[in-house]
Amino acid sequence: MLRPPSRSFGVAVSTPPRLRRDAQANLQKLRAAAIAVFSQRGLSAPLEDIAREAGVSIGTLYNRVGSREELIDAVVPDIAGAKLKTLRDRTLSQDSPRSQLETFIAEMIDLQRSDPAMNDAMLRRYPDAVLLINACERSMALGAELVANAHSAGVLAEDFTTDDLMAVLWLAGMASHDPAAPEGWRHVVDRSVSAAWLA
């Protein structure tokens, strides 16, 4: 089985040795602000807003963290780690291949709908944020394993593949944060999965 998202995510910011106390304080403020702003507005939130939330200048932000991707990776454990572990644990607590895959899909869609940052992560909008992509790939690997298990159990149509699972989650991620998306998008997603079950 897939191991839970690692707790050993490194802070990807460039932190000089013996950082001055005020610089350390600024770095902690930036991390806290990034967690808050990214979670509320997604990973594309203006860095100026994060600097403002932290009470520092945008120059200080760039000096301390370097880039958006480095800042994203610095807060991966707080944004994604615990949530993806919870998703994994709830999924694997189910007692059948079908219920595991159903739970995985439902939990993933709920996470995408409720958390703009996680939705951006699952849609891989920042592929250079290496730690974030790695965390998401571990969850997608779990999804692929669940599809294979459902095939082996004879409960899922063979022509419903991992690519179909990714397409379902992509559609949910795009539609859930698009004000122009048709109101019935979730029904379409659910129906596309329901049609693939054999038992």
PLM regions: where:
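Amphipathic alpha-helical packing segments from all-alpha helical-bundle domains
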Residues: G81-L84, S114, D128-D163, A167-D178
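Basic, helix-initiating cap at the start of DNA-binding domains
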Residues: M1-S44, E48-E53, E70-D73
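Hydrophobic alpha-helical connector segments
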Residues: A74, K85-S114, D128
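Short linear capping/connector segments at secondary-structure termini
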Residues: D120-A129
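Helix-turn-helix/winged-helix DNA-binding modules
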Residues: G42-L43, N63, A157
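Amphipathic alpha-helical segments enriched in hydrophobic/aromatic and basic residues
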Residues: F38, P46-L47, I58, R68, ...
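C-terminal peripheral helix-coil segments that are non-catalytic and often amphipathic
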Residues: M1-S14, M140-A141, E145-A153, V168-L171, ...
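Short hydrophobic/aromatic patch on the recognition helix
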Residues: G55-V65
